Amino acid sequence: MSDNEKFNDALWREKLTPEQYRICREKGTERPFTGEYWQEFRPGRYHCRCCGELLFDADTKFDAGCGWPSFYTPATKTAVREQLDTSHGMYRTEVLCRRCDCHLGHVFTDGPEPTGLRYCINSASIVLDSEQVSFTPSTL
């Protein structure tokens, strides 16, 4: 059973703010230039807001000018999973937490070297490692 299946909708709503729930569980998107981390460049690691899984290292974060936190690679090859997103009449690659299926954002092929990728991530879906997460891995 995946971690996502262990929690029902009521528990996710209890543990997340309404905005976090809309983005993480309903695949929403925060408005550009409004998220907590779009201009954050402290060292550290970014974890999944829902389950605490390590997702991105701050040293791979860059200013893409798009208004969302952007990274050129995940922390590990297995941190995230990708799937086709055809919502809103577009073809995009959605990025989700591999552990709990939290919607993180999208990945695009207009990023910097060394990968050429831009993981465009909602601030509401992540937390910097020095901050509290809604669920810690031990509670899943």
From Swiss-Prot:
Key words of the record: Metal-binding, Oxidoreductase, Zinc
Matching PROSITE patterns: MSRB (PS51790)
Cofactor(s) it depends on: Zn(2+)
Active site: C120 (nucleophile)
InterPro entries assigned to the protein according to its UniProt record, in alphabetical order: Met_Sox_Rdtase_MsrB (IPR028427), Met_Sox_Rdtase_MsrB_dom (IPR002579), Mss4-like_sf (IPR011057)
Domain MsrB: 9-131
UniProt: Zn(2+) binding residues: C48, C51, C97, C100
Cofactor binding summary note: Binds 1 zinc ion per subunit. The zinc ion is important for the structural integrity of the protein.
A Pfam family assignment: SelR
CC per GO annotation: cytoplasm
GO BP term, example: protein repair
Molecular-function GO term, any one: peptide-methionine (R)-S-oxide reductase activity
SUPFAM superfamilies hit by this protein: Mss4-like
Lineage top rank: taxon: Bacteria
EC number: 1.8.4.12
Catalytic activity: L-methionyl-[protein] + [thioredoxin]-disulfide + H2O = L-methionyl-(R)-S-oxide-[protein] + [thioredoxin]-dithiol
Xref: PANTHER family: METHIONINE SULFOXIDE REDUCTASE (PTHR10173), METHIONINE-R-SULFOXIDE REDUCTASE B1 (PTHR10173:SF52)
Entry similarity comment: Belongs to the MsrB Met sulfoxide reductase family.
Protein name (database record): Peptide methionine sulfoxide reductase MsrB
Lineage: Bacteria, Pseudomonadati, Pseudomonadota, Gammaproteobacteria, Cellvibrionales
